[in-house]
Swiss-Prot record:
SUPFAM superfamilies: EF-Tu/eEF-1alpha/eIF2-gamma C-terminal domain (SSF50465), P-loop containing nucleoside triphosphate hydrolases (SSF52540), Translation proteins (SSF50447). InterPro entries: EF-Tu_GTP-bd, EF-Tu_GTPase, EFTu-like_2, EFTU_2, G_TR_CS, P-loop_NTPase, Small_GTP-bd, T_Tr_GTP-bd_dom. HAMAP family: EF_Tu_B (MF_00118_B). It comes from Protochlamydia amoebophila (strain UWE25). Keywords: Cytoplasm, Elongation factor, GTP-binding, Hydrolase, Magnesium, Metal-binding, Nucleotide-binding, Protein biosynthesis. This is Elongation factor Tu. The lineage of its organism: Bacteria, Pseudomonadati, Chlamydiota, Chlamydiia, Parachlamydiales. Its EC number is 3.6.5.3. Residues 10-204 form the tr-type G domain. Residues 19-26 are annotated as: G1. Monomer. GTP hydrolase that promotes the GTP-dependent binding of aminoacyl-tRNA to the A-site of ribosomes during protein biosynthesis. Mg(2+) binds at residue 26.
Amino acid sequence: MAKETFQRKKPHVNVGTIGHVDHGKTTLTAAITKVLAEAGGAKFRDYASIDNTPEEKARGITINSSHVEYETDARHYAHVDCPGHADYVKNMITGAAQMDGAILVVAATDGAMPQTREHILLARQMQVPAIVVFLNKVDMLGESDSELLDLVEMELHELLESKGYHNSPIIRGSALRALEGDPKYVESIKQLMKIVDEAVPTPQRETDKPFLMPVEDVFSISGRGTVATGRVERGVVKINDKLQLIGLGDTRDTVATGLEMFNKILEEARAGENVGILLRGLTKTDIERGMCLVAPGTCTPHTEFKGPVYVLTKEEGGRHKPFFSGYRPQLYFRTTDVTGTIELPAGVEMVMPGDNVEITVKLIAPIAMEKGMRFAIREGGRTIGAGTVSEILK
């Protein structure tokens, strides 16, 4: 008898709380779970359980972050909250928490602070499509302070506009008072989630995107031809589909003449599946690990790009010393290392362990590259940093 399939009745969306330290990100996360738990859409998580974050590893970097889940009438959400500022930077740059939208928490008593700005900039660099603002701690201001609130809102709108976030909605409330059950502030949490439902776009499913599979291994089957194996990153491939092999050399056209998974023949392979693809007209020497099989014309090979990186501290297993322009590490993309030369921005003399900085990179060989793609920086096989491609130059 066939196994039952898991029914996804609602679209799934990933969100996260961002903002300056002590502006109430974790308290808001707790308040959302409490208010939605009362409506039957979540399990209440108190502040302490969210704040006590487990360590996780992403691309060799240790990150502390808490994941909670909840449902509104319209959607199922996975929500990430990070305790420390460095954890946010690492989380966003390594893509440990891919966000479809962010809830920016700003204390009305402070307004926009340095980390508020930095998190908005990071969200933009990481292509987070939408930001909804929760103006927290409004209960600490008197009724006469409504002009101050208007000023804070104006400043936030200007800041968000300058980073390309137009018409970001702002909801006023108090996460702490909502946690305490004050009806007025519970209502502001309900309003916030209604706005998040509307303002954060539903992400396109991975299977709806054009096909891409990074090659992990290659072997020949006598009498059949050459097989490339790997995990399908996105999209769908069917037998007899035309494909392109790109990266590390010249682009080659081919056709998928057969598909296998666990020695079973497939009609099609979908995002997330580990498969072998039999390729027409290619020999084993034409293909190597690190190349990508893609739907024709959907992805191109490049060697030069810009992007933000986070450099690990010594304690995190990173370098003990700074590096300078002209530094030549390995850059690990998808399934392979490629040597690249790093140039620092004008006015930046060196990068210390623990810094995050925007770098320009020239690779010695082209790879299938796209905006938003993640990479690790490695030295002698260990990860010493991680980054994201924010702009392709060549």
